[in-house]
Amino acid sequence: MAMPSYSSLSSHISITTTHTRPHPIFPCYNDTQSIPRFFISSDTGSSASKQRNIYLRLGSRKIIAGVGEGATSLSSHSDKMKTDSFPDPKLAKRDFPPGFWKDDIIDSIMSSNKVAAADEERVETLISEIKSMFRGMGDGETTPSAYDTAWVAKIPALDGSDHPHFPQTLQWILRNQLKDGSWGEEHHFLTYDRLLATLACIITLTVWRTGKTQVQKGIEFFKKHAAMMEDEADHRQPSGFEFVFPAMINEAKSLCLDLPYELPFIKQIIKKREAKLKRIPTDLLYTVPTIFLYYLEGLQEIVEWHKIIKLQSKDGSFLSSPASTAAVFMSTGNTKCLEFLNFVLMKFGNHAPCHYPIDLLERLWAVDTVQRLGIDRYFKEEIKEALDYIYSHWGERGIGWARENPVADIGVTAMGLRILRLNGYNVSSDVLRTFRDENGEFFSFMGQTERGVIDMLNLNRCSHVAFPGETVMEEAKHCTERYLWNALEDVDALDKWGLKKNIRGEVEYALKYPWLRSLPRLEARSYIENYGPNDAWLGKTMYIMPYINNGKYLELAKLDFNNVQSIHQKELRELRRWWKSSGFAELDFTRDRVAEIFFSIASSMFEPELATCRDVYTKSTICTVVLDDLYDAHGSVEDIKLFNEAVKRWDLFLLDRMPEHIKICFLGLYNLVNEIAEEGRKRQGRDVLGYIRNLWEIQLETFMKEAEWSEAKYVPSFHEYIETASVSIAGATLVLFGVLFTGEVLTDHILSQIDYRSKFAYLMGLTGRLINDTKTYQAERGEGEVASAIQCYMKDHPEFSEEEALKQIYTLMENALSDLKEEFLKAKDVPDKCKRLVFDYARSMQLFYQQGDGFTLAPNMEIKQHVKKILFEPVP
């Protein structure tokens, strides 16, 4: 039987809550500064005689709250409680693992990991320098390519004289031979790359009968290292190597250069080239742009030049390649080719790069870099300008590395699709169909079946921003996951298109923590550790892009991460103090998860200016956990009915009827609500007390409903269960408190887009409830709980086994997550920070419950390491 989607459920499940007394969104209450506020204080004296007195503060006056006959005081000892009519019942406490992040542990870690305060002046300098890099992005910055320069230097003078047309390029070759006799990227060594560049340079010098010393040194280098190619992995071959290298070997032989032509590897690659040349579909070669245009210099004997000219790019190049364009010019004399080469040398002076322009590639990767490093908030204008530029060149078949590039690149296209969609641009996933073959597999370029890890990683990350019904994105997800898992099994899993510091680490993180199961600060920490400021790229030759791989990005990211972490540590210490002063720390039926809760919000809403949002969210979540545990561990339904009644009436005079543990819970909630209301009024410019109370009433009624189910051993229908449980998970309640403090003044219309009336909130609660139940239902069933999504689904569908029902629940959850993504990415009326808070709550639930009950069992699970890395361990 097909699992119903959330939309089919919504016809049965009311998203609005009508069973509580109605409140307008912001009902008119008196000024919140006059609201009575209770707090607990400890008298001095011995521990045996310490009394915690309840005080009512009205303005500057402090009076003892009158309860029954005289003042009520709360003692830490139950035998001193005056609860004659309602004795404290025995609670059915669950056996929770004790909290790990106690004050002594936190202090110990923080003292051993102290770092110097961030140099604010250095931070500002780095921000300014990176902004200048963004503003300076034109057609792309890249390093010289000895290989391409050698091809440009081969062009003879147009006047027929025996000289190169671009003599400065020949001089560059003569002056830039490396000490070992090779040419190429000095700080990175790949045998294929060095031998290719060296062979091109010694051929060009020989053609112009100059640089005999350099030629001889180059030949010696070639002889010494040629056999090493056999041992270097195939995926380290530059693009088109199998065509251009054998072609140059043949040319070197015709020039009588003393090279090891009889090496088995060289003979083998020449044979492979001959076989591949026969398989090139000539009809495809001349009708549509393919990657073959990138290395035409290696296909000269089969190319019909008058036909290939029809595929020339608008800028006169052939796929932005100086070498390929130079080869076409020498065979055709095409003036547009010459114009392109003049354009390149006007930019670089005496050398040519591997390809140029690279404007789209550079902008996308720079944006991706600052976003993944967690420093994008400093560059909002620059990012917007870069993405507007990308979008202006977006095509229905994707984009390549340059605006005039007629051959789309799957890596650039996938990154562009993901980043543009995440930033609110309207882009279709249909562009990915360009890169799919008849077997449903994805390739990097038209005309090439090879794939690289970086390309497939970008495609995988792109697939996670799919909208419902985008089958090509789902296919991309499955294809890339299979490819990337296989790549990880290879000990030498490197990449075809680049030399990255830790591509394995990037892939492992992406597969283990996909976008919906990650959080921004967690990803930033991971990428800071994996990012390589000196990474190189591999096209036809190796090159470096300084606006993508730059130590300034990493330095700023580290300074910023550690600075933000130090702010979060101070906030956590204050929250730990509040946890104790509220009395919650003394309750033995609840879970101490202050650090884990704070981690969940600090990993998302991490900016220093959102301190109040973090504080309110954390305290509200703590209070919710305490109350949830209270209702789960209740001694009698009557007690919690009394608690609910007190909240509805907001009546302090019900305190004398409450057992001690319920008094602590009520006072904690009462003080917190008033605290939030006071601050909320300042931020929103209107009274929010009624709004906040109404949210708590809705929340507690769902707790009450579940307690009644538990008491009666009642298993509701799946629809009835979801109606209550998607609210009791508390996501909407917590988020709706937090959004008041995101820096936005929220209208009733904005709130209606994210509160209980909205699809957004419903999906958030539904996905949170379902992932929670899948990981907790067995343990809770063992403790006597009978209602969970799995058990309720099995009640409706007795033909399903437990395992089958669980699969159905996962299917429903994934469908709801897909719908939630669409709401997040398409919502236009909701401020970004409000959307983030809603969406990242859902992501945090997926993270915490990814492998089990990562909240209750947090001290024994991977969440513990996440908390440590984000909150306590500075980046070295």
Curated annotation (Swiss-Prot):
- Residues binding Mg(2+) 1 are 628, 632
**What cofactor does this chain's UniProt record say it requires?**
Mg(2+)
Its annotated pathway reads: Terpene metabolism; oleoresin biosynthesis
Give compartment(s): Plastid, Chloroplast
Top-level division of the source organism's lineage? Eukaryota
Residue interval of the organelle targeting sequence = 1-64
Q: Which GO terms describe its cellular component?
A: chloroplast
Q: How is the cofactor bound?
A: Binds 3 Mg(2+) ions per subunit.
Top-rank EC class of the record's enzyme: lyase
Q: Where is this motif: DDXXD motif?
A: 628-632
Which UniProt keywords are listed?
Chloroplast, Lyase, Magnesium, Metal-binding, Plant defense, Plastid, Transit peptide
- Which chemical reaction does it catalyze? (+)-copalyl diphosphate = isopimara-7,15-diene + diphosphate
About its domains, the entry says: The Asp-Asp-Xaa-Xaa-Asp/Glu (DDXXD/E) motif is important for the catalytic activity in the class I active site, presumably through binding to Mg(2+).
What task does this protein carry out? Answer: Involved in defensive oleoresin formation in conifers in response to insect attack or other injury. Involved in diterpene (C20) olefins biosynthesis. Monofunctional enzyme lacking the DXDD motif in the class II active site relevant for the cyclization of geranylgeranyl diphosphate (GGPP). Requires (+)-copalyl diphosphate ((+)-CPP) as substrate, but no activity with GGPP or ent-CPP. Isopimaradiene is the major products of the enzyme followed by sandaracopimaradiene.
For this chain, the family text in UniProt reads:
Belongs to the terpene synthase family. Tpsd subfamily.
Protein's recorded name = Monofunctional isopimaradiene synthase, chloroplastic
Organism listed in the record: Pinus contorta (Shore pine)
Gene name on record?
A: TPS-mISO1
